[in-house]
């Protein structure tokens, strides 16, 4: 299985998040910490997950003036997380500063294209007149030209990114749902197997696992599905 699943710890309570890490750790070795859990648990939650032998994806989606992002990424690197995110919309200079701050570290900077909660109408409402697919291609192309190696996009755009002259070596896909499951606030969703077929290197699964009665069972189902696809 080349594609690696990441479980999103979208929980308000650090102790509950750590319980879930311990429960799933025999099967999963990569966990995402977003803004809610990071604000609740601080840097300690990052260290405790890493102490469990797992990698951490710190998903704070930095989008600020270039020097502020440089300073933020400088602090993130000290935590020894595997991935962290910046909004590509912050522009070339901001992306360059993020890369400079992470240089020489093991922390990979991922560029966020268009949130999976957005669709064409959502983009139009904030003044972006073209379709999601066009915006994702534009942003991903710019990020890769600047030097980022990783892109975050929905599974719907994977085929388009595969046609770019410069390819991303890391493609992280959130918005993972099984057929028939509630989409909630996600607009652009995909099943895990389809994401793998499309070329994703990582899928982020949160709510389906968090809300499952048998969390381990669902993770095992996920791994079986991914292993079955060559």
UniProtKB/Swiss-Prot annotation:
Catalyzes the decarboxylation of orotidine 5'-monophosphate (OMP) to uridine 5'-monophosphate (UMP). Homodimer. It is an enzyme of class 4 (lyase). Pathway: Pyrimidine metabolism; UMP biosynthesis via de novo pathway; UMP from orotate: step 2/2. This is Orotidine 5'-phosphate decarboxylase. It comes from the Bacteria. Pfam families: OMPdecase. Substrate binds at residues 10, 32, 59-68, 116, 177, 186, 206-207. The keyword Plastid does not apply. Its EC number is 4.1.1.23. Belongs to the OMP decarboxylase family. Type 1 subfamily. One of its GO terms (molecular function) is orotidine-5'-phosphate decarboxylase activity. It catalyses: orotidine 5'-phosphate + H(+) = UMP + CO2.
């Amino acid at each position: 299985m080349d594609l690696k699943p990441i479980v999103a710890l979208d929980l308000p309570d650090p102790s509950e998040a750590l319980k879930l890490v311990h429960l799933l750790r025999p099967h999963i070795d990569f966990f995402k910490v977003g803004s809610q859990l990071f604000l609740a648990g601080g840097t300690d939650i990052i260290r405790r997950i890493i102490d469990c032998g797992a990698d951490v994806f710190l998903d704070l989606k930095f989008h600020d003036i270039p020097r502020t992002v440089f300073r933020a990424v400088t602090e993130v690197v000290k935590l020894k997380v595997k991935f962290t995110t910046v909004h590509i919309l912050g522009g070339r200079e901001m992306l360059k500063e993020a890369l400079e701050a992470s240089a020489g570290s093991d922390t990979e900077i991922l560029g966020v294209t268009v949130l999976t909660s957005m669709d064409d109408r959502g983009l139009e409402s904030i003044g972006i007149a073209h379709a999601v697919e066009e915006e994702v291609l534009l942003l991903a192309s710019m990020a890769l030209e600047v030097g980022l190696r990783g892109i975050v996009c929905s599974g719907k755009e994977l085929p388009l990114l595969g046609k770019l002259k410069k390819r991303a070596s890391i493609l992280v896909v959130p918005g993972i749902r099984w057929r028939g499951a509630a989409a909630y606030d996600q607009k652009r969703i995909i099943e895990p197997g389809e994401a793998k077929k499309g070329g994703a290197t990582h899928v982020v699964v949160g709510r389906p696992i968090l809300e499952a009665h048998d969390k381990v069972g669902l993770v095992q189902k996920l791994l079986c599905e991914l292993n079955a696809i060559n």
